[in-house]
């Protein structure tokens, strides 16, 4: 008998299920993707909820499913419009993978999200968690859906001290959930675990006295709930120093640039920018040389207007922001010139939305009497 089997034998699993599910059915939050448990909408919500808080997701979800209400609508949509609808949520590979996957659903499965574990799990961007969450919630399949919330809850329930930052640890929790999950109500069970982790069994200050499964919790019994789960610390993100410029011409049109189709923030739009180096030249001087060499642009460039910081999981951008008026341009093939009204139609990463906001505030100040 392995350690997990020994821990499972000590639990009244049926009573745990009953206590968790009855609490969830009584206390669950009203969330828009729970209204009809449509497989497509559940799928969209689960993709949005990766790395993003529920409160942030709700308005994005409502706008997204209004604009793309069905598999077919999203499959047939122009990528620019999809990226614009996702603008601000970040982690844009999520929505690119989602659109690729729904195209396959439309083509291979007649627009119906496949209920089969192998079929759905084979779609682009569908990992073990998304597969378990969507199929259990929408199709009532008894499949584990193990994310950080669930690992935290179950590490405390079963007193599991394995490092949850290590990929191999996930299999321990998947095995545990297979033993625990209700075959009659897998949707309510998985959602109950997620809800418990979000509302009660929180990372730093769990509300153990309010917990519906407190009597089943080994960590509560041992007084170790604040020590679990074990999670090794990530490396500090690297720092990239950059300079960006909001360039306008004499008509007030703005120059923007599209990022490459692969890599970080692929296919999003941004203002001309470069990675700067410490040395003899100032950031402003480096920017002047970059505009000349890359685009053949000569411009009157302001002094430093401010700095925008944006934090990714693995990287921090520190962007020095400048404004400029184009005097001469010899090659605009790498840039797009748009009006300020047209600019609102393009999807920009959050960092460059902040830059544009900074430009708008500066213009408002200079225009003030």
UniProtKB/Swiss-Prot annotation:
Site residues by UniProt (Transition state stabilizer) = 147
Identify which top EC class this enzyme belongs to. hydrolase
Effect of deleting the gene: Cells lacking this gene have a 100-fold increased spontaneous mutation frequency. A double mutM/mutY disruption has a 1000-fold increased spontaneous mutation frequency. Triple ytkD/mutM/mutY disrupted strains show increased mutation rates during exponential and stationary phase.
Q: Tell me one GO molecular function of this protein.
A: oxidized purine DNA binding
Pfam families, A to Z:
HhH-GPD, NUDIX_4
One record GO biological process: mismatch repair
Q: Any idea which residues are catalytic in this one?
A: 46 (proton donor/acceptor)
Entry-linked CDD domains: ENDO3c (cd00056), NUDIX_DNA_Glycosylase_C-MutY (cd03431)
Triggers of expression: Expressed during exponential growth. Expressed as both a monocistronic transcript and a mutY-fabL-sspE transcript.
Tell me the residue numbers annotated for binding DNA: 33-34, 51-52, 89-91, 129, 313
Per the record, the similarity remark reads: Belongs to the Nth/MutY family.
What this chain does, per the entry, is described as: Base excision repair (BER) glycosylase that initiates repair of A:oxoG to C:G by removing the inappropriately paired adenine base from the DNA backbone, generating an abasic site product. 8-oxoguanine (oxoG) is a genotoxic DNA lesion resulting from oxidation of guanine; this residue is misread by replicative DNA polymerases, that insert adenine instead of cytosine opposite the oxidized damaged base. Shows a powerful dicrimination of A versus C, since it does not cleave cytosine in oxoG:C pairs.
Q: What is this protein called?
A: Adenine DNA glycosylase
* Gene behind this protein: mutY
